[in-house]
C-alpha cells in the first residue's frame, strides 16, 4: 500500500509502476526505496553471461522514479548512482515528470495523451480532417459492437495481423495477455471491439483504467478494419465515454511518424519520456551496447 501511494502521488499516474502491475510483468522486480516510501524506483535485475544488467520489462513504458516529495535533478542522479552499484549495464526509461540533470544526453521518446475535461462536442471539433473522414467512413461501414469479445480474441487478432511486422515475441505478447485479462477481471480495464457484417472481429482495443488514466495497451485491427476506419471509431467511443471528466487517455506513443499522426489526429499532445543509459561494462564489451547518455 505504501508503495502504491507513492506511485499514485502524481496526478493521473501511468499504470506501470503500481505493485500489482509490476507483479504481472516482472515477478522478480526489485527497487530502491527512500525513507518511508517517499521515493521509490523499480529495478529489474537480469543476468546474461555473468553480466548483471537492468532494463524495462515488456508491457511497460516509463517506469519511475516516483516520489511524494519534490525530486530534483540531483536526486535523480543520486538514485541512478545508487542503482548502478548493482549493475554493470542499465537501461532506464524515466517517467515524463522526472527532472533530468543538464549534462545528461538522454533520448526523448514520444507519448501521446489527451485530456477529456472538455465536452465531447469540443473534443470532436479538435479532430484533424483525416480523423473526421476516417470516423465518417467507419460510421457508414455497418460495424457492430463486439460485446462478447475477450482479451484472447483481441490478442489473436493482433497476432494474425501485426506480430510478423514487429520484433515482439510470442512470449512477450502472451505475457501481456495475462496482464490484460487480469485488468479486465479486476475492472481495471475496458475492452472495445467491433465485428463486420459477417460477424468477424475486425478491430479491438484494450485499455487499462486506473487512477484517472486510461492507457491503450493493445490496439489490434485487420486490414479491412483499418480500411474502414474501425480503430478511429473505437478511440472515438473511448473519448465519448470520458468526455467532460478529469481523465487522461494515454495512447502510449509513438515515435513512428504514421502512428504519431494517427494519435495526434484526435487532438492528443506529446508528453515525452526519456531513455537513459549507464554503461559500465568492461571495455571489451562496452562497444556492443549504447554509450552512457551523459557528458
Role assignments for model-derived ranges:
Residues 77-81, 178-288:
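Aromatic (often tryptophan-rich) hydrophobic motifs at membrane interfaces
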Amino acid at each position: 500500500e505504501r508503495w502504491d501511494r507513492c506511485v499514485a502521488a502524481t496526478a493521473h499516474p501511468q499504470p506501470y509502476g503500481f505493485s500489482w502491475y509490476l507483479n504481472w510483468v516482472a515477478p522478480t522486480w526489485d527497487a530502491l526505496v527512500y525513507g518511508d516510501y517517499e521515493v521509490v524506483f523499480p529495478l529489474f535485475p537480469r543476468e546474461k553471461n555473468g553480466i548483471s544488467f537492468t532494463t524495462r520489462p515488456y508491457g511497460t513504458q516509463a517506469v519511475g522514479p516516483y516520489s511524494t516529495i519534490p525530486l530534483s535533478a540531483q536526486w535523480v542522479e543520486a538514485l541512478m548512482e545508487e542503482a548502478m552499484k548493482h549493475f554493470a549495464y542499465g537501461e532506464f526509461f524515466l517517467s515524463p515528470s522526472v527532472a533530468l540533470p543538464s549534462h545528461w544526453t538522454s533520448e526523448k521518446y514520444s507519448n501521446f495523451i489527451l485530456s477529456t475535461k472538455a465536452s465531447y462536442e469540443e473534443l470532436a471539433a479538435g479532430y484533424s480532417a483525416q480523423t473526421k473522414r476516417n470516423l465518417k467512413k467507419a460510421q457508414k461501414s455497418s460495424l457492430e459492437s463486439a460485446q462478447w469479445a475477450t482479451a484472447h480474441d483481441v490478442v489473436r487478432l493482433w497476432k494474425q495481423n501485426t506480430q510478423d511486422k514487429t520484433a515482439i515475441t510470442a512470449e512477450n505478447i502472451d505475457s501481456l495477455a495475462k496482464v490484460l485479462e487480469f485488468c479486465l477481471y479486476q475492472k481495471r480495464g475496458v475492452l472495445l471491439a467491433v465485428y463486420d457484417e459477417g460477424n468477424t472481429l475486425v478491430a479491438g482495443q484494450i485499455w487499462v483504467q486506473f487512477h484517472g488514466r486510461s492507457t491503450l495497451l493493445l490496439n489490434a485491427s485487420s486490414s479491412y478494419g483499418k480500411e474502414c476506419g474501425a480503430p478511429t471509431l473505437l478511440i472515438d467511443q473511448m473519448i465519448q465515454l470520458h468526455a467532460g471528466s478529469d481523465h487522461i487517455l494515454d495512447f502510449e506513443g509513438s515515435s513512428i511518424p504514421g502512428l504519431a499522426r494517427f494519435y495526434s489526429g484526435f487532438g492528443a499532445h506529446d508528453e515525452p519520456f526519456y531513455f537513459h543509459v549507464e554503461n559500465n561494462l568492461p571495455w571489451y564489451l562496452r562497444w556492443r551496447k549504447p554509450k552512457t547518455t551523459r557528458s
